[in-house]
Regions:
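Long, charged, helix-rich clamp/arm modules that form nucleic acid-engaging surfaces
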Residues: 54, 58, 106-107, 130-267
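A common structural junction motif
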Residues: 40, 44, 122-126, 163-169
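Conserved glycine-bearing catalytic or ligand-binding loops at nucleotide- and phosphate-handling centers
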Residues: 20-82, 112
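A short, contiguous, amphipathic alpha-helix enriched in charged residues
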Residues: 103-128
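Hydrophobic side chains in well-ordered alpha-helices
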Residues: 32, 114-117, 157-158, 266
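Short amphipathic beta-strand starts and helix->beta connectors
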Residues: 3, 80-90, 124-132
Length: 267
C-alpha cells in the first residue's frame, strides 16, 4: 500500500502460510524514519551504523531486551532471537518487608495467564518467600505487586520468576515478506531499500497522474481561449446549427482547429 511511513516495520506483523511463517516485531516510528533518512544519505551504511539510529524492536508492552547480539543478527540476516525481560522495581514497606512491582511485561504475554502461572508456583512452593500477589493494573498501566517475607531474598525470587514464568521470554524474529510478489527473508536494510523504492514508485505515479490531469485541463482551457477569441462566430455557429451535438462539435473542430474534447467542453 502507498503508506506514508514504513508500516511493516513500525507495526510489525506475524502470520503463517503453507511452509513458511513471518514474525516481524514493531519498531519505534521516529527511529525507523530516521533510519530511512540514514539509508537515503548513505546506501552503503553498515548494520552497526544503522543500529545507532534504530536501536532495535520497540514493543508496546515495554520490557527490556537483553543484549544486542540477537538484534544485530536479525538486522543482518532477517532472522534472529531476542530475550525480553519484564521491568520491575523493588520497594521497601513501612513494616520492613519488600515488594516487587512489575510494570512492563514481554510482548504478546497474556497478563492473566502470567499471574495464574505465578500464583500456581507460589502455591506449589516452587517459589518461596512470597506472602502476597495481586494484579493492580489499571488504565494508567500494568502493575503486578508481589510482597515478600522479611527474610526473603528478592534476587533469588526474581531469578526463579524469570526462569519459570513468561516474565522473561524469547521472541523469534523472522522478517519474511513479499518482495516483487515472491516471499523473501529480508535484512533490515533490504526492507528499508524496498520501502524507499516503493515510495519513489508511488510519488512518480502520483506525479504522472497529476501531470496528465493538468495537461488535460490545460488542453480544455486552450480550447476555451480559442473560443473566446472568436466568441461571436462560435455563438452564431451554435445558434444557427441544425445538427446534433456530435455534428456541431465536428463543425467547431473544422472551423477553429479544435479537438473533439475541446469542442465538447465549449458546448
Amino acid at each position: 500500500l502507498p503508506s506514508r511511513y514504513p508500516n511493516l516495520l513500525v507495526n510489525g506483523t506475524s502470520g503463517i502460510a503453507v511452509g513458511m511463517a513471518t514474525n516481524i516485531p514493531p519498531h519505534n516510528l521516529s527511529e525507523t524514519i530516521q533510519a530511512i533518512f540514514a539509508v537515503m544519505d548513505d546506501p552503503d551504511i553498515t548494520v552497526p551504523q544503522l543500529m545507532e539510529v534504530i536501536k532495535g524492536p520497540d514493543f508496546p508492552t515495554g520490557g527490556i531486551i537483553l543484549g544486542r547480539k540477537g538484534i544485530r543478527q536479525a538486522f543482518e540476516t532477517g532472522r534472529g532471537s531476542i530475550m525480553i525481560r519484564s521491568k520491575y522495581r523493588v520497594e521497601e514497606l513501612s513494616n520492613g518487608k519488600k515488594q516487587i512491582i512489575f510494570y512492563e511485561i514481554p510482548y504478546q504475554v497474556n497478563k492473566a495467564n502470567l499471574i495464574t502461572k505465578m500464583a500456581s508456583l507460589i502455591r506449589d512452593k516452587a517459589i518461596q518467600g512470597v506472602t502476597y500477589l495481586n494484579d493492580e493494573s489499571n488504565r494508567e498501566g500494568i502493575r503486578i505487586v508481589m510482597e515478600l517475607k522479611k527474610d526473603a531474598q528478592e534476587e533469588v525470587i526474581l531469578n526463579q520468576l524469570f526462569r519459570l514464568t513468561p516474565l522473561q521470554t524469547s521472541f523469534g524474529i523472522n522478517m519474511l515478506a513479499l518482495e516483487n510478489g515472491r516471499p523473501k527473508q529480508l535484512p533490515l536494510k533490504d526492507i528499508i531499500h524496498d520501502y524507499i523504492d516503493h515510495q519513489v514508485d508511488v510519488v512518480v505515479r502520483k506525479t504522472q497522474f497529476e501531470l496528465k490531469k493538468a495537461q488535460d485541463r490545460a488542453h480544455i482551457l486552450e480550447g476555451l481561449r480559442i473560443a473566446m477569441d472568436h466568441i461571436d462566430e462560435v455563438i452564431h455557429m451554435i445558434r444557427s446549427s441544425k445538427k446534433d451535438e456530435a455534428g456541431l462539435s465536428q463543425d467547431l473542430c473544422d472551423a477553429f482547429g479544435l479537438s473533439m474534447i475541446q469542442a465538447k467542453a465549449i458546448l
